[in-house]
């Protein structure tokens, strides 16, 4: 089966969906996702989304991001992220995202590890869910965007140094999708780890496909642990992340002797390392405690309803019980190398979100910068594609001959592998 579109978007997280929404409405767009539409890490995000409070906050926010990333960040990418944060948050508000607000109507901000001030917008403790639900509603209002769920990208179609679309499997059938532009927003690779905060099916598919075609990759060795994941010895795979905002609102990390052993609001790598050092002292009890018992029950229930209930279901009550926590894989800072417009080293192939790497995070992402990265660079990517397709007179679809040539090469390659076997 062959389908033809102007733009193919692979991934239903914030990067893919936000980009699709900002592409011109006269473009014919296909968005596919490996599982269901809502099955993405963006939907799981709890703490919030960072934003510069105003232009005076730029230097501080830039420094916080650089410091968290151990100054291995790409400075241009960091400056872009920070300077374009507020206007993209406003776009989310315009879409209808119901961020928590103060009595005067202004945004209510929280603080997380590595931030020098309160600059994280949120919706209770399910920010990702509320953002994504809003974006999905806007997505379904767009007649020019077609969505196919449970559709797995297995390869891209390539001719010379240009991407011509993708090859997918849907309901057991192979589909060739011809597209002028292809966007890989396939998420991270947490599903490869035994202990992770990610969905198990997030296995770095987009990065693997890029590697196969010698598309440039950057900082793939930069992987992040989240310090506070609920310790459940019988749980394998996706675990319950206890948001950094719990510490931002006063939670403290304590060892088994009930002693505070680390500044709970240090960057994630620092806190994770400190926890692992504590765990080495008692390998039979591989956890430390997150202490929220000094906080008011009603505050905890109202500010963190999802986490309060999730912990209660497991027999822990935040206002009276110490919560056992340990680090788990959370995020990949590296990925497909892109510029500030999402362009990869292969023409007409773009990448965004956790699958991509601008270098904005350095070797350790600052808390709540991931959702922001998705929308800032997603918006820039959309505008770049809009401009490219307009300037080139709507470009041209890959020719039948180009696609046939690629498929012949693919058949020959697989046949050679079979002979070798």
Regions found by a protein language model. Give the residues of each.
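N-terminal Rossmann-like FAD-binding beta1-loop-alpha1 element of flavoenzymes
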Residues: 7-31
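Conserved N-terminal glycine-rich FAD pyrophosphate-binding loop of Rossmann-like flavoproteins
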Residues: 35-66, 70, 237-238
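A glycine-rich dinucleotide-binding beta-alpha-beta segment and adjacent secondary-structure elements
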Residues: 148-149, 154-163, 167-169, 303-357, ...
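Glycine-rich loop(s) and the adjacent beta-strand/alpha-helix scaffold that form part
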Residues: 181-234, 371-375
């Amino acid at each position: 089966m062959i389908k033809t579109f102007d733009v193919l978007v692979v991934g239903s997280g914030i990067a893919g969906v936000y980009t699709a929404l900002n592409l011109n409405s006269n473009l014919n767009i296909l968005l596919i996702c490996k599982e269901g539409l809502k099955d993405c890490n963006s939907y799981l995000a709890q703490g919030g989304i960072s934003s510069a409070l105003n232009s005076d906050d730029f230097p501080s926010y830039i420094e916080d991001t650089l410091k968290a990333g151990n100054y291995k960040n790409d400075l241009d990418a960091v400056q872009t992220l920070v300077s374009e944060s507020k206007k993209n948050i406003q776009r989310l508000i315009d879409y209808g995202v119901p961020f928590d607000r103060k009595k005067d109507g202004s945004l209510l901000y929280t603080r997380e590890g590595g931030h020098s001030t309160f600059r994280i917008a949120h919706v209770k403790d399910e920010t990702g869910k509320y953002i994504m639900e809003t974006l999905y509603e806007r997505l379904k209002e767009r007649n020019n965007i077609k969505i196919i769920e449970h559709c797995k990208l297995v390869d891209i179609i390539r001719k010379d140094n240009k991407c011509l679309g993708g090859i997918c499997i849907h309901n057991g059938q192979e589909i060739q999708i011809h597209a002028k532009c292809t966007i890989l927003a396939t998420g991270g690779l947490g599903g490869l780890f035994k202990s992770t905060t990610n969905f198990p099916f997030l296995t770095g598919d987009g990065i693997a496909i890029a590697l196969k075609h010698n598309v440039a990759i950057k900082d793939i060795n930069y992987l992040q642990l989240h310090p506070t994941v609920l310790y459940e010895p019988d749980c394998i795979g996706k675990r319950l992340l206890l948001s950094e905002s719990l510490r931002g609102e006063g939670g403290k990390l304590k060892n088994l002797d009930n002693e505070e052993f680390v500044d709970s609001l240090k960057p994630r790598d620092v806190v994770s390392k400190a926890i692992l050092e504590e765990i080495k002292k008692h390998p039979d009890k591989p956890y430390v405690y997150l202490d929220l018992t000094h906080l008011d029950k009603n505050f905890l229930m109202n500010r963190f309803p999802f986490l309060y209930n999730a912990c209660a279901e497991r027999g822990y009550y935040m206002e009276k019980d110490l919560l056992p926590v340990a680090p788990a894989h959370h995020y990949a800072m590296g990925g497909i190398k892109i510029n500030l417009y999402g362009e990869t080293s292969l023409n007409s192939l773009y990448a965004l979100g956790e699958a991509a790497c601008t270098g904005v995070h350095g070797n350790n992402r600052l808390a709540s910068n991931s959702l922001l990265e998705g929308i800032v660079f997603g918006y820039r990517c959309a505008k770049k594609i809009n401009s490219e397709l307009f300037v080139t007179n709507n470009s041209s679809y890959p020719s039948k001959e180009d696609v046939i040539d690629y498929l012949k090469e693919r058949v020959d390659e697989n046949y050679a592998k079979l002979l070798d076997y």
